[in-house]
Amino acid sequence: MNKIHLTLVFLSLIGVVRAQTETAADTSLLQYVDPLVGSGGHGHVGVGANVPGGMVLAGPTLSGTGWDSTSGYHYSCNEIVGFAQMHLSGTGCSDLGDVALMPSMLPLELSREGLASTFSHDSEVARPGYYAVTLDRDLIRVEATATDRVALYRFTYPRGSDDAFVTIDLQNAVGDRLTRSRIFQVDDFTLCGFRHSHGWAADQQLWFCIRFNRPIHNFYSDGPSEPYARATFEVKAGEAVMAKVALSPTGEMGAMLNMRTEMPDWDFRAVRDEAARRWAAELSRIRAELPTRSQMRTFYTALYHTLFAPQLWNDVTGDYRGADGQTRYGAAWNNLTTWSLWDTYRALHPLYTLVMRDRMPDFINTLLSITQEQGELPVWHLTGNEIWCMVGCPAVPVLADLIVKGIVPPRQRASAFSAIAKSLMRDTRGLPYMWSHGYVPADVDEGESVSKSLEYSLAFGAAQQAASALGLKEDSAALQTGAQGYRKLFDADLNYMLPHQKDGSPKPMPDFNPCHQTADYTEGTPWQYAWLVPHDVQGLIGLYPTQQAFITRLDSLFLASAELNADANPDITGLIGQYAHGNEPGHHIPYLYNYVGQPWKTARLVRQIMSTLYTDKPDGLCGNEDVGQMSAWYILSALGLYQVEPAADRLQIGTPSVTRAELNVGEGRTFTIVSRNLTPRNIYVQQVKLNGRPWHEPYILYKDIIAGGTLEFVMGAKSGKMW
């Protein structure tokens, strides 16, 4: 014990400060963020205290266990089972909820049910970097704030006691199974241990250090490997016990060092205020003005939710546990996790390339390191684990986009393209058929062949764009079969993408119904997947006899009956006809009208989606937040922009909802968007000027945005015209 105590003292002398790009913080923007938006309905957002991109999301885990409780929190539930240090936000699957604390006045039964206490939403306070609630059982006030890797709690006890309790629960989390754990007392103030679990992440390994501001009066445990422990404290009425909980992916010593570096003191207000400042700085990357307070709340809460992940998965020293289970030491960059790429390549990552270019080196280094560790780019990474969730090669369009936009530095471009090539050439998940057939045959695959083929096809198309940007003509040509393979799935009679067999014939589908999900589609229907060719929209249009035939077909998507079969995937939500905004495969579809000279239809649909499927209430999202993708769609669309094509040099023009927005695009440059004559009726763009000159294209180039300047819209009620 003395050796460990001396180590703690030694570690307190070490300081490793995470490098950050300072942004002028406008703290007034915090008033527009409500962290409870999206915590009801199907939003699945996590609620608690964190900082942008931090490892910790410290807050309540509720007793609900259904699909809508994947984050550990759903607004319909009023029972807390513990305050855990990590939570997912917006995902369709459950995990995390690790290392939970629960204060009480008396010893509680050591079970999920025994620890639970009801609460009232009236007692909740949720702000960026801060969460508070009062437990009904003992009227204990619980407050939480955080740094990157450390949670800080303040438990205020209403009555005095010689034994005020804090129970540490390593048994229960959110949807996983405990495999190994340890908790032991280091000194009069400190507990350490680890929690290993199997869940969505098959081999999650997390270490922790808990330090209290008061000496532990009694410590109760049936042994270090038992998953529950109790610490008691002497308190007077109204006094607080504070607890720091530091996390590490590498070991207990890493957790201790993270605590000593990030939170050496006990000033709760200072930590809370610094968390708020960091949030304000990130939100200030876009200084937007919208017509109503409700729109301002929706906009800035959406921007807040885009900043949760990817999140840190390393120690302050740079040490981290890689995808191969090996610990790397002293990385000069921040290793990141929570890569929900099938969702986020569509809008979240394009948004990052506009206003968060300074964060991209960590993104690039992490993607390349994961490739070295597991042989390919990540598909869905959580706590350093590849969980293989969703279809396609979704990191390919992300990395290809960074190449095309010149964000990958010259010294890393060869390795970046090599990572793309390795990922597309894997002998798994049907990929070899993309090279030989251009699609994944339905009769040799385990399912979802259409969705897999289309996702692969757009990844091949994105890789082609990266190859072209790097002058790799032979590589670009070699990718052609996969990039154009979508054509082989198109049925010209039905106008759907249909599953095909290895011999090229359509798969027999005697009960085909385009409004119903089948085993050949991922979280969607034939209606919704008929348009998933964002890398070659003109090629998709060319599959129809005429451009007007394409327009008529696109119109019919939004006019069709919204009926779904009873066992439809719950992700198919937010329906306008058969367009499903509550899930990602269709997010680009409203912008396809730009490609056929009818941008006013894009404007009408985008405004309808924004005004009816997003609100500033707990049920304000029509589908899963999906780690920022749903919110990123809103942010870009509110700015009047959207990137349809993966790995593209342009963003499509839609209909701005901002009257003015200033984007910090980096290196001291600002890109300003101004909307004149904007009213609830004036939703159609009449004129566009770029830096004072008339602009007649339905898109704006990425290079013109990051160069800084002004994009001016003149809005009106008249539709049916180009600008």
Annotate each predicted stretch with a short phrase.
Residues 21-397, 401-454, 462, 467-488, ...:
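Accessory carbohydrate-recognition regions in carbohydrate-active enzymes
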Residues 459:
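ATP-dependent phospho-/nucleotidyl transfer catalytic cores
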